[in-house]
From Swiss-Prot:
The C-terminal part of the DNA-binding domain may contribute to DNA recognition specificity. Residues 201-221, 323-359, 589-615 are annotated as: Disordered. Residues 203-219, 606-615 have a biased composition (Basic and acidic residues). It comes from the Eukaryota. Gene3D superfamilies: 2.60.200.20, Winged helix-like DNA-binding domain superfamily/Winged helix DNA-binding domain. This is Forkhead box protein K2.
């Protein structure tokens, strides 16, 4: 490539391209820096304090004199005190000249200022083999040899205050110039097709070599704890000082060489607060100062395994969505779900996005009709966000269980399970409709059996499970009215002898009249009544069912009625009761004796309501009454003997 200047053809050997400028190199040596009172440079990079007055020098190595001499390789010599990054590799001041590749990128430390270098000259042998490219002359008045960056765009290339904004220069390729109409020092150029192919090939080679190598100046994808583990595990004796950890990190990750020193504070905080790092004091024999840091031996294997595990970049969700055909990298959404995901969807759905977007067209019947407690909110198909992952369609059904309203109360309870018998009758579930709260009672049907201790209701032989009968909870009625509890008895299954093993008592009655409803009358307790009542018939005391049910019932062909509060059996048969119960019954039936105040005060206090007295108190009172009666009887006998 050549440029005609004042009728003379000047070869262009290389191109330097920045954000807002482009410079064509037509001589063997070019200096890059910033202009000052001491002198000017060929390429001025503005007034940034991070750039020295003479920062870089690019020259051509080869034999011959003059501009038309044979062109060899390009070399870079660093003259600035801050150094320079060449494709992510830091080049220090005073280092030997670095041979430049055909395409590379320079970046000044602590800034985002970059220069892309492209070598346009080829060897003499290649010139003979390759066809000459056409030359297009440009206007002679726009071919300066020295360029300057205007001050009005200096803010675009000023250094950033935070190291987090540093952009990596690795894997960068020649970018197209921005602002084609705004740059006043832009030159016309013609690039041969073979050079374009070489530039593309070099870019592909760099991509294949791996852009996130340790020499990359971008921020490494590791946490500070991982960097500490890497440094300590790579030490010969598995321990390092704080300064040694700093040195290891800056040596392997160039990003931290020029970044803000705040990362060192983070390293110190991790060492102090992380329980996996142990501080080991330095022995007196060891020279130097500062303690060593080691890894907890109990957790060393686990930490070493995770030391080089890369973190997810910020902004990426920490969970993987289920696999599906929809994502930003996959095929377009199906028409049925066009309302759920837009074309710019990223494949990650949030509750807010689901509520804003429309519902998909259902492909199946409404699930709320099949199951009223489930309401289908959304059905969506997701895709794995990782590139190159296999796609699969798995529907995700989001459901919400509806709770029954508080006003709806169940009114039917099942108290008996269907019993399988040897008869031909079909088992029927017995259902008891509860009008008021009553004790649990289970009634079963007995067919084909007429033994003793069975009773007939409505033409059916019935057996009552006494083991299920429980004493009901007593409720006081202030007005003294009786409270009725009705139980509706419906059809019940038939059972045989094996099913009777669970029934503890079988009672026979001679009643054969049809009966549809069993009415249980609850007798309220008075103010001074005890929960135990004495019921006598034919001079025989009767005890409550809670006591009588423990004994064996032997009387047959006798009529009984069921009374609540307390539950008692009444009849003309004989009952076996303990003396304690006889005394308790007698004491409850006897009248209480009046008492007088010791101070002789005639005024009497009103009676205070007494609570329920348990059986122990009744027995104690009964014992006192019996002892007093026995003492009075003994005194009377002594007086009679005298």
């Amino acid at each position: 490539m050549a440029v005609a200047v004042c009728g003379a053809v000047v070869p262009v050997v290389a191109r330097l391209e920045g954000r807002e400028f482009e410079y064509l190199m037509k001589k063997r040596s070019v200096t890059i820096g910033r202009n000052s009172s001491q002198g000017c440079v060929d390429v001025s990079m503005g007034h940034s304090s991070f750039i020295s007055r003479r920062h870089l020098e690019i020259f051509i190595g080869g034999s011959g004199d003059g501009d038309d001499a044979d062109v060899g390789d390009f070399y870079l010599r660093c003259l600035g005190k801050n150094g320079v990054f060449v494709d992510g590799v830091f080049q220090r001041r005073g280092a030997p000249p670095l041979q430049l590749p055909r395409v590379c990128t320079f970046r000044f430390p602590s800034t985002n200022i970059k220069i892309t270098f492209t070598a346009l000259a080829i060897d003499k042998k290649q010139k003979l083999e390759a066809p000459e490219s056409p030359v297009k002359p440009v206007q002679p008045q726009i071919s300066p040899l020295t360029i300057h960056i205007p001050d009005n765009i200096a803010h675009l290339i000023s250094p950033l205050p935070s190291p987090t904004g540093t952009i990596s220069a690795a894997n960068s390729c020649p970018s197209s110039p921005r602002g084609a109409g705004s740059s006043g020092f832009k030159f016309g150029r013609v690039i041969p097709p073979d050079l374009i192919a070489e530039a593309a090939q070099s870019e592909n080679d760099k991509d294949a070599s791996g852009g996130d190598s340790p020499k990359d100046d971008s921020k490494p994808p590791y946490s500070y704890a991982q960097l500490i583990v890497q440094a300590i595990t790579m030490a010969p004796d598995k321990q390092l000082t704080l300064n040694g950890i700093y040195t290891h990190i800056t040596k392997n990750y160039p990003y931290y060489r020029t970044a803000d020193k705040g990362w060192q504070n983070s390293i110190r905080h991790n060492l102090s607060l992380n329980r996996y790092f142990i501080k080991v004091p330095r022995s007196q024999e060891e020279p130097g100062k500062g303690s060593f840091w080691r890894i907890d031996p109990a957790s060393e294997s686990k930490l070493v395994e995770q030391a080089f595990r890369k973190r997810r970049p910020r902004g990426v969700p920490c969970f993987r969505t289920p696999l599906g055909p929809l994502s930003s990298r996959s095929a377009p959404a199906s028409p049925n779900h066009s309302g759920v995901f837009s074309a710019h969807s990223s494949g990650v759905q949030t509750p807010e996005s689901l509520s804003r977007e429309g519902s998909p067209i259902p492909l199946e019947p409404d699930a709320s009709v099949i199951h009223p407690k489930l309401a289908v909110i959304q059905e969506a198909r997701f895709a794995q966000s990782a590139p190159g992952s296999p796609l699969s369609s798995q529907p995700v059904l989001i459901t919400v269980q509806r709770q029954l309203p508080q006003t709806i109360k169940p009114v039917t309870y099942t108290v008996a399970a269907p019993v399988t018998t040897a008869t031909s009758q079909q088992a029927v579930m017995q259902t008891v409709h509860v009008v008021h709260q009553i004790p649990a009672v289970s009634v079963t049907n007995v067919t084909g059996l007429t033994p003793i201790n069975t009773y007939t209701v409505g033409g059916q032989t019935m057996v009552a499970q006494a083991a299920v009968m429980a004493q009901p909870k007593l409720e006081h009625q202030e007005n003294g009215d009786h409270k009725e509890v009705k139980v509706k008895v419906e059809a019940i299954p038939a059972i045989g002898h094996p099913a009777l093993t669970t029934a503890s008592r079988i009672i026979q009655t001679s009643s054969s009249a049809p009966l549809q409803t069993v009415t249980i009358v609850q007798t309220p307790l008075g103010q001074h009544q005890l929960p135990i009542k004495a019921v006598t018939q034919n001079g025989t005391h009767v005890v409550p069912i809670t006591t009588a049910i423990q004994g064996q019932v032997t009387t047959a062909n006798s009529s009984y009625s069921l009374i609540e509060s307390p539950w008692q059996w009444r009849g003309n048969g004989t009952r076996a009761a303990s003396p304690l119960h006889m005394l308790a019954t007698h004491a409850s039936a006897s009248a209480s004796l009046p008492t007088k105040r010791q101070n002789g005060d005639q005024s009497e206090q009103p009676d205070i309501k007494r609570g329920k007295t348990d059986e122990r108190e009744v027995l104690a009172m009964t014992g006192l009454d019996a002892q007093s009666e026995m003492a009075m009887a003994a005194s009377n006998e002594q007086e009679n003997q005298k």
